[in-house]
Amino acid sequence: MRKIALFPGSFDPMTNGHLNLIERSAKLFDEVIIGVFINTSKQTLFTPEEKKYLIEEATKEMPNVRVIMQETQLTVESAKSLGANFLIRGIRNVKDYEYEKDIAKMNQHLAPEIETVFLLAEEPYAHVSSSLLKEVLRFGGDVSDYLPPNIYHALKQKKNDWS
């Protein structure tokens, strides 16, 4: 059986922490599907199409990684429809673990054939979130160390558009 993993998220924007998880997942699984979830109730910086394109560019050297846009639904339902038998979740700290553990237990109840795999965030990304980076950038801080170059440039352009 092929090992297919879904890594779902809003990725607004995708960070080097996300990219690190994707690189590590690509070594563990036959295929990694990055699911850019479309949440119409959430205000995002990038459109789903922009996020998909930016992530594809950042992961283009990984042949077993593909990026899709996915309407918001139960993650396990997305995994089933894509043929994924694993879900990837990144854990930065104890708070993330407690939150993700409960979701993983519910997902296991809903779809016992799908296994959740937790990957611990590596330094220097363990403290980084997309929200934090957007906030730092908004006030003029340098976030270039935490973003893939193409995403950093796109984010800077968005910031210029805000001004």
UniProtKB/Swiss-Prot annotation:
The lineage of its organism: Bacteria, Bacillati, Bacillota, Bacilli, Lactobacillales. InterPro entries: Cyt_trans-like, PPAT, Rossmann-like_a/b/a_fold. It comes from Enterococcus faecalis (strain ATCC 700802 / V583). It catalyses: (R)-4'-phosphopantetheine + ATP + H(+) = 3'-dephospho-CoA + diphosphate. It is found in: Cytoplasm. This is Phosphopantetheine adenylyltransferase. GO terms for molecular function: ATP binding; pantetheine-phosphate adenylyltransferase activity. Keywords: ATP-binding, Coenzyme A biosynthesis, Cytoplasm, Magnesium, Nucleotide-binding, Nucleotidyltransferase, Transferase. It is an enzyme of class 2 (transferase).
